[in-house]
Amino acid sequence: MSGHPGLTTHVLDTARGKPAAGVRVQLCRVTGDTRTPVTEAVTNSDGRTDAPLIERGSLKQGTYELTFHVADYFKGFVAAADPPFLDVVTLRFTVGDTSGHYHVPLVMTPWSYSTYRGS
């Protein structure tokens, strides 16, 4: 998988049918009950972060959490509930093969979300 970054994300707002710009994303490494911050970013107009969350070669085996601050995003739209139903969405996942590319998208509406390991 030469040329691919280690860990990336993408946020899509399926209620509006477009990428979700301005979503704050935090990445932590999880060891037992301890969460160690790795990085924080905000999605751009394409719903992606400007840089990989972890570069290829720096990705380590272990458990990670991506936290998406979706309430702040949805507060900007009339169709969302007040207060928004979803506040933060936290995805916990495990990295086994550090030579691979881990793309962890969030597909969301104001009331639901899903994820998958993309390419």
Swiss-Prot record:
Alphabetical list of Gene3D superfamilies matching this protein: Transthyretin/hydroxyisourate hydrolase domain (2.60.40.180)
Catalytic activity field: 5-hydroxyisourate + H2O = 5-hydroxy-2-oxo-4-ureido-2,5-dihydro-1H-imidazole-5-carboxylate + H(+)
Protein's job: Catalyzes the hydrolysis of 5-hydroxyisourate (HIU) to 2-oxo-4-hydroxy-4-carboxy-5-ureidoimidazoline (OHCU).
Subunit structure: Homotetramer.
Record keyword Calcium present: no
A biological process from GO: purine nucleobase metabolic process
PANTHER family: 5-HYDROXYISOURATE HYDROLASE, URICASE AND TRANSTHYRETIN-RELATED
Binding site for substrate: H10, R48, Y116
Additional observations: HIU hydrolysis also occurs spontaneously, but more slowly.
Protein name (Swiss-Prot/TrEMBL): 5-hydroxyisourate hydrolase
EC nos: 3.5.2.17
Pathway membership, UniProt: Purine metabolism; urate degradation; (S)-allantoin from urate: step 2/3
Transmembrane feature ranges: none
Organism superkingdom: Bacteria
Keywords attached to this entry: Hydrolase, Purine metabolism
SUPFAM superfamilies in the cross-refs: Transthyretin (synonym: prealbumin)
InterPro entries, sorted: Hydroxyisourate_hydrolase, Thyroxine_BS, Transthyretin/HIU_hydrolase, Transthyretin/HIU_hydrolase_d, Transthyretin/HIU_hydrolase_sf, Transthyretin_CS
Organism: Deinococcus radiodurans (strain ATCC 13939 / DSM 20539 / JCM 16871 / CCUG 27074 / LMG 4051 / NBRC 15346 / NCIMB 9279 / VKM B-1422 / R1)
Statement: the UniProt record of this protein carries the keyword Protein transport: no
Signal sequence, renumbered to the chain: none
Family: Belongs to the transthyretin family. 5-hydroxyisourate hydrolase subfamily.
GO molecular function: hydroxyisourate hydrolase activity
Top EC group: hydrolase
